[in-house]
Amino acid sequence: KADNNDLDVQQQLLLKAPSFLQAQEGMDADKWVTRLQKLYKNYVAAKAPLKLINENDYRIILTLEGDEDKEHKQYMIDLMNDHLDDWMKKLGKAPAYYIVEANDIFAEDMAKDGNVKYKDYVEKVKNQYAKAYEVVGLTGITPYEKAKLYFDALYNLYKNKDVDGYVKAMETYFGKMENNLRSADYGKAAQNLYMAAGKSLKAKDHEVAIKWAEKALAQEDAVMDRVNYMVMIGDSYRELKNYAKAREYYNQAFAETLTLQNMEMPQAMLQSAIKHKLSTLELLEK
């Protein structure tokens, strides 16, 4: 184990890592990312399990853990979970949310890959990580019921391309989740329909996608997300050959991009994509 002085110096260095990395360019930046990742992992190993339980180290974990190294992320959330009471005494509910979010992402990635191992992560909701999931708190549905319903539906959609089964399962999910839902939940459901089944969606599926995306749009304030939902709705209307409605939503999306502040790059990319959709629409209308 490294001595404490050395670890204090490393902590200061790791806290400054994000702003330091922003200043690097090209090959240098890549080299530093690799070096900092190595330093970070050694630092975590030297202080695990209990010496990491403080605000500064939690900030370091949030900044540098990332999602690239799944094995290390699994180690990290298990480390937190094994000492969750201590973590929560120091930092409130945040570490529980971190565990839940990471486990949900693991389950989602597996389900979308059509890998039945997603079920292992769903089972952790009611056993290994039960306490963390309790903290998140739901009304009218248990965290396990929620996870099972959602990830079973997702797996079925991506693995079996069973759109009808997915729509039915998600309507049940939305019904049971009613008081816990966020706009993004509807948006993601619509997006998964496009991502998994895209070209094979029937007219009735596009109608469902429009309904979900409109619900998401009605409750969403973030400009990028609003633009995304408007374009999705426009795409569905285009597939339904309702070109007037498609144009209306594409134009709305374009107008929305004008409100993006200090974001020239994403603004230009979005506008060019929407213009392309509008010109494609003109060809279809001829």
Language-model regions, residue ranges each:
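Terminal, low-structured helical/coil segments at or just beyond the last alpha-helical repeat
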Residues: E248, Q252-K286
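Boundary/linker segments of alpha-helical solenoid repeat arrays
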Residues: E178-D185, D221-R226, E256-Q271
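TPR/Sel1-like alpha-solenoid repeat signature
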Residues: W212, M230-Y237, Y249
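Residue-level recognition of tetratricopeptide repeat
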Residues: Y155, Q191-G198, D235-R238
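Preference for long, solvent-exposed alpha-helical segments and helix-linker "stalks"
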Residues: K1-G187, A203, L260, A273, ...
